[in-house]
Structure formats: structure tokens, C-alpha cells
Amino acid sequence: MIGRRLAVILATVVLIFCPRGVPAADPTPELVARGKYVFGAAGGCACHTTPDGAGLNAGGTKFDLSFFGVVYTPNITPDAGTGIGKWTDAQVINAIRRGERPDGAKLFPIHPYKYFSNIADDEIEALVAYLRSVKAITSTVPARSLKIPVPARTIVPAVKIAPRDGRARGAYLAGGAGHCAECHTPRRFDASTDDTKFLAGGPGPERSLAANITPHNETGIGRWTEAQIARFLRTGVKPSGHEAYSLMRTVIVGTSAGFKDLTEADALAIARYLKTVPPIDNKVR
């Protein structure tokens, strides 16, 4: 009887102090490595590392959002004073998936939590483990200056375990960590994506132009083979021989990891998925 009561007490303690979705023990090297892969599938979270900044994930990239205001990417290193070092795993996950800081402040949706909310439980836990493994950097970024309230975005509950292969894997990667639609889907006046033109390209962040990546034969990538799409994702080289530039080049190269580190199987899975989305005639350039 005493043994049974002790087991119940211990189980209760675990449930209270180690809630589901938050690792209870020190992460294994395998978990950290998997987290780095997820980090790379997100383009190395390149917005959080400025070329002349303080270092990996130290933040400080400025986004001038016109009439919305100005925001800066935060320091996401494990520094206790200026980064996320004092945040719990659950708080880090909440910021990634829901765009909410521990103090309740909402992140401006230039942080793609609409898509990051799709990252599976097992992979987001690995991602947090990796974020905690990088060098802590003391770097204070400027405060944001918004002219309007932070727009709300729809959050989709994540799956518990990430799909492992096939089109489902490709859809998961493109619609989650890869957040392809964040740049490749045109925006409405309120900065939300116009999903009637899903992946059809147009003006992107930082005055860039995002390509039409629907399988339209004339204005999209309909004439590209799956192998050519996969090669582009990993190398930045188009079938024409031209290379990616601007933001696309940034996410391919990444930081400590990027699209270049995708496995061939995952790159092909994304390619297969892109071949199945509705083709849209939209000439970007």
C-alpha cells in the first residue's frame, strides 16, 4: 500500500512540474541534433542573426513595416538577461507556436507563428533543446515601435508526431518549419496572407520578390521536375543554372543550418507536395 501511494505521489509531482510537451531531463545529443535539423528546415531562423550583429540568434534585424511600425527580431540565445535563458521550455514553445512572450506581450506576426504552430510536439521539443545549446550572447535589441495593435492570426493545433515520409511529410515541412507561404503567398492590406493566391508569389519581405512556386507551367514551377525542385532547395541552383538570391539564398544557406542541410528525402517530399498544390497563373517577374 505504501509503495502504491508513493508511486501516486511521484506521478503527481511529475505531472505538476514536468508538464506534457516539456522535456524533464537534460537533452541528449541526439535530441539537440534533431533540433538543429528542425532549425535548418526553418531556414536557420536567419532573421534572428544579422550579418554584422552580435552573433548566432542574437537578434537585432530591423523590419520597417510601413504604417504598421518598426520591429526588431529578438535575442533567442540562452542569455539570462537579454535572451530566453530564464524562459521555461513551455514559454519558449508558446512564443514559437503562438507568438506570445511570457509577459503576455504578442509578437508581431512577421514571426511566422501561423506556420510554426504546425511544428509537431516531438520536433518542437527538439528545437528548444537546440536553441538552449547555442552560445548565450548578451545583446539588447531596440524596442519595437508599433502604430497599431498586433494583428491576430489563426493558430492550428500541432500534431504530436511529425510525418516521416511521402507527400504528408512534404506538406508538413513546407507548411510548418519551412513556412513557405510566409513569403510566397501575397498579402492583404492587414498583412495577412491571401490564401486564394496560395504560393503564387509577389512582393516579399524587405522589398524582395517571392517567386510563384505553384505548379503553373508558364508562371510557376510546373515545368520543373521533382528532382530539380529538390536540388534547388538544397543548393539554390535553378534548372536554368541561375542561382537563388536575396531572402531565398539566405534561408538555403541558413546560419548554423539551413535548407542546404535538408536530407534528399525531405527535399523530394517538399517537391512532391509543391507539385500537388493548385496551379495559379501569376507572373511575378
PLM features per residue range, with description:
Residues 1-4:
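N-terminal secretory signal peptides that target proteins for export/translocation
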Residues 7-18:
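Bacterial N-terminal signal peptides
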Residues 22-40, 150-176:
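Electrostatic cytochrome c docking/interface patches
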Residues 30, 89, 106, 123, ...:
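Ligand-binding pocket scaffold of soluble enzyme catalytic domains
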Residues 36-70, 98-106, 134-138, 175-207, ...:
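Periplasmic/extracellular electron-transfer cofactor-ligation site
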Residues 43, 62-94, 114-124, 191-238, ...:
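Electron-transfer interface patches adjacent to heme c in soluble/periplasmic c-type cytochromes
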Residues 139-150:
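Extended, well-folded interaction surfaces typified by the phenylalanyl-tRNA synthetase beta subunit core
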